[in-house]
Structure formats: C-alpha cells, structure tokens
C-alpha cells in the first residue's frame, strides 16, 4: 500500500513537471484573454461535469470573492452550480443542452466561456462551446488526452490548455492547479499592488 501511495505522488509530480514545460504559453494567453474580457466589462461563464464542475465552481467563486488577497469582486458564473436550472432543462430530456441554453441566455459578445472537460468529449460541454461561438464569445478550454471533440471547435482567438496526460485523475489535479494559476495571474494583472 505504501508503494502505491508513493506511486500516486510520483505520477502527479511527473505530470506537473510535464505541464510546467508544455503549458506556460497557453496559460498566459488564457489569463490575458480573461483579463481583457473583464477589463472590457464582460463576464466569465464556467462549466464542467463532476470534478471538472468543482473546478469551474472554484474558479467562479474565487473571482467573485477573492483569491489570496482582498480585491473587488469580478463577474463570473458557474453554470453547473444551479441545480434547479440543470434539472429543469434535464427533465425536458435536454441533458446535452444544460449549459448551452444558459450560454445562449446569459452569454454576450466579449464574454468568455471557461469549459473544463477531462477528455474534451462531454456532449453538454461541446454544445456549450458551440453556443458560445454563436454568441461571439471567446473560449478557454481546459482539456486532457487528445483534446477530444472540444479541441476541434476552437478558433484562433480561443485558447486550449491541454494537460499532457492520459490519466483522468492527473488531468483533474492539473486543472485545479491551472485554475489557481489563472486566478493568480488575473489578480496580479488587474490588482498588482493588492497582490504583493
């Protein structure tokens, strides 16, 4: 059992090292995309399922409340947080539309959709991205594996942060670290004196 525990830590560390080599440019581009949207008076919509949904909610909560230092609230909505909306749409046999309907209702040109999907193939996330495209929104996608269907939907203005792993658990861990990096970069860019 002890060796298995050490193996989990070792695999996580190796994934972090690979990500630290592969992802800084994409994370920087994503942070700048998010910052520019916020500076323009827009908002961030976030979505994900399961652990990816927890990461989406963490991102939205951090923007609304704070990351590591006090600062003004920033507009973000986790589309997976409202169980009444989700079950109302799902009850009408439109499970694939649970996020897309919200994007069409709440999203505007200049907003950003933060879409988190470990494999990039979740139908409801794919449909949310398709809806965001019709609303002239920019997409920041956190993925893993080969990026899945989601990667193929992204345009030049969009950013994919693809974790270099084929293990869902490691990808989810790195998505959380990436979300924290994005929050740190947003705070340090928008509020440099408060972040010191």
From Swiss-Prot:
Annotated SIS domain residues: 34-196
Molecular function (Gene Ontology), one example: carbohydrate derivative binding
A biological process from GO: DNA replication
Cross-referenced InterPro entries: DiaA (IPR023070), GmhA/DiaA (IPR035461), SIS_dom (IPR001347), SIS_dom_sf (IPR046348), SIS_GmhA/DiaA_subfam (IPR050099)
Pfam families the record matches: SIS_2
Keywords, ordered alphabetically: DNA replication
The keyword Cell wall biogenesis/degradation belongs to this UniProt entry's keyword annotation: no
Family: Belongs to the SIS family. DiaA subfamily.
Subunit-structure text: Homotetramer; dimer of dimers.
Biological role stated in the UniProt entry: Required for the timely initiation of chromosomal replication via direct interactions with the DnaA initiator protein.
Protein name per UniProt: DnaA initiator-associating protein DiaA
Organism: Edwardsiella ictaluri (strain 93-146)
């Amino acid at each position: 059992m002890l060796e298995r525990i050490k193996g989990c830590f070792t695999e996580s560390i190796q994934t972090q090292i690979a990500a630290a080599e592969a992802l800084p440019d994409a994370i920087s581009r994503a942070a700048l995309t998010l910052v520019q949207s916020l500076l323009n008076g827009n908002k961030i919509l976030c979505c994900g399922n399961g652990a990816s949904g927890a990461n989406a909610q963490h991102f939205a909560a951090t923007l609304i409340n704070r990351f590591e230092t006090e600062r003004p609230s920033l507009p973000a909505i986790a589309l997976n947080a409202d169980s009444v909306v989700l079950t109302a749409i799902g009850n009408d046999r439109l499970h694939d539309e649970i996020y897309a309907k919200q994007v069409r209702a709440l999203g505007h040109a200049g907003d950003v959709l933060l879409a988190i999907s470990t494999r990039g193939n979740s139908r409801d996330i794919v449909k949310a991205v398709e809806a965001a495209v019709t609303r002239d929104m920019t997409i920041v996608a956190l993925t893993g594996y080969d990026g899945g269907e989601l990667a193929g939907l992204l345009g030049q203005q969009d950013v994919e942060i693809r974790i270099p792993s084929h293990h869902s658990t490691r990808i989810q861990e790195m998505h959380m670290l990436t979300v924290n990096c994005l929050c740190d970069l947003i705070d340090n860019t928008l509020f440099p004196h408060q972040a010191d």
